Amino acid sequence: MRSFARADAHIHLFEGSYQGNSFTRRPGVLIDEVLCYQSLMQEYQIQAALVIGFAGESWCAENNGFLAELIPRCSWMQALAYWDLNSDRDPLEQLEEWRGQGFIGISLYVFEKLEIQGLAGIKDEVWNWLECNGWLISVNSSGGRWSLWKPILEKHPRLRLAASHLGLPSKFSRTPSRDEAFKMMSPLNELYEFPEVHVKLSGYYALTDPAHDFPHEATWPVTEVILKHFGSERLLWGSDFSPCLDFLSFPQTYELFSKMPFFNEEDREKILGGNLLRLIGGEA
């Protein structure tokens, strides 16, 4: 296999480390996630990473501020600010502030009713700003909620959207048939007609039961359906550091692609770095 630089399309960095259902919540456990990830970058030849802001829980409410402090110190990171869809802050004013801090996009979580309502309430002038400035929009959502994006993209087809974790189609304890895979992926796959929509092949541990079921064969049919619709040029590997480390070793987050028979070496090089580096203006 040829040697090439990797680029990670989905990591998190939290002050005091990730406090979800993780070993880092245990008393006395303290991890410097920045130093930890930088050591992984060196060991596994990672050139750049998209840092996905998340401030939707009390323990990480100041995550945007933490990332803003890191941006000038970490040239390898491209940070996306977490946008609370129910915030009272003027959105254009907020976007300009984030741009001044060095963010290159926004991170949206669209699951609950209020979040769906917040998405529907975004005005055209905001989408225009995001479109004209070429900002990346990382979205965590699932199922039929992906259909919410079609009317938005029809009006703003140059929005640069990246769907996280294969669009979170389901949690698989068995391998679905091809027909089942096609049906469950149809809301996301409807967005393939918009050329700036990308899909992150990330968070596989969250899609299989058990989570440590490497190489996650139960997800292969939905992965292949995504490949057939979007092509390898619009797929992005994301490790989902550091939550992934509760279930997998770091290299397992990308080694699974070498197990999937429908990816060739050229596909893997694009997915593991080339595509993201082009998106963020780095060398492919």
Give each language-model segment a name:
Residues 14-30, 172-174:
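Acidic/histidine-rich helix-loop elements
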Residues 1-9, 22-48, 224-225, 229-236, ...:
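Mid-to-C-terminal alpha-helical segments outside catalytic/metal-binding sites
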Residues 117-236:
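Catalytic pocket-lining loop regions of alpha/beta-barrel enzymes
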Residues 31-37, 62-66, 90-93, 146-149, ...:
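Alpha-helical scaffolding within the catalytic cores
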Residues 10, 41, 67, 98, ...:
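Conserved, mostly hydrophobic/aromatic
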Residues 58-144, 150-151, 204-206:
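Active-site gating/metal-coordination segments in enzymes
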Residues 25-52, 57-72, 96-97:
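Alpha-helical scaffold segments that flank or form the walls of functional sites
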Residues 7-11, 49-51, 78-81, 106-108, ...:
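Hydrophobic faces of well-ordered beta-strands that scaffold small-molecule active sites
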